[in-house]
Amino acid sequence: MSNIPTELKYASSHEWIRREEDGSYTVGISEHAQELLGDMVFVELPEVGDSVSAGDDCAVAESVKAASDIYAPVSGEVVAVNEALEDSPELVNSDAYGDGWFFRIMPSDLSELDNLLDAEGYQAVIDEE
């Protein structure tokens, strides 16, 4: 059973999002997603300054099993990327909700957060797979 922190919001495509003190939002993939993908070998991140729309593929997680697109849960501007993943993609496996984050986004439309799932809703998505 995967760990699904209740303080996060989730996309049905297995990304999580967390509000930071400066108003930006950190994005990563869920523990469930990294378990399905297996050991990460490479992560392709967006560029700081990129504008993304909700649902856009903007990063790639490559594992020993597959390459998977990572989608922006909300629209906005990429304000930071986790450069540690370039040398240590395995952080996604060891700490999916912490050091394994992918990028931070400054949202342009906060109402898009209402389209995301809470932990219970995300668990229901996993259960249907």
From Swiss-Prot:
It holds the Pfam family GCV_H. InterPro entries: 2-oxoA_DH_lipoyl-BS, Biotin_lipoyl, GCV_H, GCV_H/Fam206, GCV_H_sub, Single_hybrid_motif. GO terms for biological process: glycine decarboxylation via glycine cleavage system. The modification N6-lipoyllysine is found at residue 65. Binds 1 lipoyl cofactor covalently. GO terms for cellular component: cytosol; glycine cleavage complex. SUPFAM superfamilies: Single hybrid motif (SSF51230). Gene3D superfamilies: 2.40.50.100. Signal peptide: none annotated. Its cofactor is (R)-lipoate. PANTHER family: GLYCINE CLEAVAGE SYSTEM H PROTEIN (PTHR11715), GLYCINE CLEAVAGE SYSTEM H PROTEIN-RELATED (PTHR11715:SF3). HAMAP family: GcvH. The glycine cleavage system catalyzes the degradation of glycine. The H protein shuttles the methylamine group of glycine from the P protein to the T protein. The glycine cleavage system is composed of four proteins: P, T, L and H. This is Glycine cleavage system H protein. It comes from Shewanella loihica (strain ATCC BAA-1088 / PV-4). The gene is gcvH.
